């Protein structure tokens, strides 16, 4: 049994596109509804919940009946614009069925790096949380492009969720993906791969495991999650990585059930 994290009050939940979109491109409405139920329930328990959600391009492709992801950046941004609107419509419908208000916040890296706009974002988030509203955050894909000396992209929402956790002084980041946690090797290729129950330090060896030959996590996958975990560990906070196929797993994670991977720094008493 892991440490009980049910006392954590301010929680950032990040959900990836793979948990929102089926492999055939259909939107996972049942999964989104379950996520809304869980987060609304936690909010009703007095917790402060922030959702970082991917999925704009995936939902946009579904809405526009596209079978393949666009290659050109302007096309990707147009699809993201359609998808973000539709995604928020779905979220609003699902959360409203549980009497929970939500708000949309779209961010770019330069907003966070500029002190004045960073403070404005922080103020807005604090006010929404005070009002009992769940902020739903995504990168602003329609304008986020890195070119020359103007850097606006976070890289991916793994990094964004860790930055949001840092900005809001969250006590816990829960990252839901299409994997059960961090493994000692690629579980698709190695039947001996072992799931880490907890990780207390992001070492070069761990990063090598994430990017090693045969790993399915090379680009914006497990490496990105480990970098996000390092940011959380540096803050002496907690991060949980688990499979988002059934969002009710969040209840198990908070209760200390041995699912997923728990990233945290051990105290001197625990070492």
Task: Report each predicted region and the residues it spans.
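C-terminal catalytic "cap/lid" subdomain
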Residues: 1-101, 105-271
């Amino acid at each position: 049994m892991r440490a009980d994290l049910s006392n954590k009050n301010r929680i950032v939940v990040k959900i990836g596109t793979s948990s929102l979109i089926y492999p055939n491109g259909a939107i996972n409405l049942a999964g989104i509804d379950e996520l809304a139920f869980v987060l609304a329930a936690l909010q009703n328990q007095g917790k402060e919940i922030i959702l970082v959600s991917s999925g704009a391009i995936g939902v946009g492709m579904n809405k526009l009946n596209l079978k393949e992801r666009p290659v050109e950046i302007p096309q990707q941004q147009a699809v993201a614009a359609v998808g973000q609107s539709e995604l928020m419509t779905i979220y609003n419908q699902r959360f409203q069925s549980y009497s929970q208000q939500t708000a949309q916040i779209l961010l770019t890296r330069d907003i966070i790096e500029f002190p004045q706009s960073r403070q404005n974002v922080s103020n807005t988030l604090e006010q929404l949380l005070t009002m009992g509203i769940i902020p739903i955050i995504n990168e602003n894909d329609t304008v986020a492009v890195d070119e020359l000396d103007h850097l606006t992209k976070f890289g991916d929402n793994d990094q964004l969720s860790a930055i949001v956790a840092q900005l809001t002084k969250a006590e816990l980041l829960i990252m839901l993906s299409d994997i059960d946690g961090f493994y000692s090797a690629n579980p698709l290729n190695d039947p001996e791969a072992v799931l880490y129950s907890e990780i207390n330090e992001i070492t070069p060896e761990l990063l090598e495991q994430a990017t090693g030959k045969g790993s399915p996590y090379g680009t914006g996958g497990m490496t990105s999650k480990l970098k996000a975990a390092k940011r959380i560990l540096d803050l002496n906070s907690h991060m949980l990585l688990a499979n988002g196929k059934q969002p009710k797993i969040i209840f198990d994670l908070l209760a200390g059930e041995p699912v997923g991977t728990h990233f945290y720094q051990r105290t001197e008493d625990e070492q």
